[in-house]
Design a protein with these regions (language model features):
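The feature marks short-to-medium sequence segments in extracytoplasmic or secretory-pathway proteins
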Residues: 54-55, 67-119
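Short, surface-exposed ligand- or partner-binding patches at beta-edge/loop junctions that are enriched
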Residues: 120-143
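Short structured motifs
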Residues: 30-32, 44-50, 105-110, 122
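Sec-dependent signal peptide cleavage junction
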Residues: 19-35
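Short, well-ordered beta-strand segments enriched in hydrophobic/aromatic residues
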Residues: 60-68
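Short strand-coil-strand connectors
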Residues: 37-41, 87, 140-143
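Sec-dependent bacterial lipoprotein signal peptides
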Residues: 1-23
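Hydrophobic residues on conserved beta-strands that form the core of alpha/beta folds
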Residues: 38, 43-45, 61, 76-77
C-alpha cells in the first residue's frame, strides 16, 4: 500500500512538472520546473501527500506557494481556478482537518489576503478514486 502511494506521488509530480513546463513557455529567465505562472500570480508546487478526509476516505493534498505579483491584495481562493482529475473524471474537494477541536482544515491558507510581492503557503485537498491511478492538476487565473 505504501509503495502504491509513493508511485502515485511520483506520477503526480511528473504531471505537475509537465504542466508547469507548458505554462512557462516563452520566458527567458531560468525556469523552475515546479513554478507555474498565471498572469499576476505564481504557484510553486512544493509537494503532495495522501491524507484521510473527515469521512475516512483517501484524499490527495497538494502544497503550493502562492505569490501575488499584482498591484492589489489577493487571495488564492479568489485568484486561482484549480481542476484535479483522475481516470478522466474531475475529483471532488475533500475536507481534511488539521485540528478537530477548532475545525481547522488544510485549506485555511487559501483565504489569506496576500499583499503585492508577498507569498503564502496554501494547500488544497481532493478525494481520490483510488491510490494507484495518476492524478493531474491544472491551474488557471480567474479573470
Amino acid at each position: 500500500m505504501k509503495q502504491t502511494k509513493i508511485k502515485l506521488l511520483c506520477l503526480l509530480l511528473a504531471a505537475l512538472m509537465l504542466l508547469s513546463s507548458l505554462t512557462a513557455c516563452g520566458k527567458d529567465k531560468a525556469k523552475d520546473s515546479n513554478l507555474i505562472k498565471l498572469g499576476d500570480y505564481e504557484l510553486l508546487y512544493k509537494g503532495a501527500c495522501i491524507m484521510e478526509d473527515s469521512d475516512g476516505n483517501d484524499a490527495i493534498v497538494l502544497t503550493l506557494d502562492f505569490t501575488n505579483n499584482g498591484k492589489e491584495n489577493a487571495s488564492y481562493l479568489w485568484s486561482v481556478d484549480e481542476t484535479v482529475m483522475q481516470n478522466g473524471v474531475e475529483l471532488e474537494t475533500a475536507t481534511v482537518f488539521t485540528d478537530y477541536d477548532t475545525f481547522e482544515t488544510v485549506i485555511e491558507g487559501q483565504f489569506t489576503d496576500v499583499a503585492p510581492g508577498a507569498t503564502v503557503e496554501v494547500r488544497t485537498a481532493y478525494l481520490l478514486q483510488d491510490t494507484t491511478s495518476p492524478v493531474e492538476a491544472t491551474f488557471e487565473q480567474f479573470l
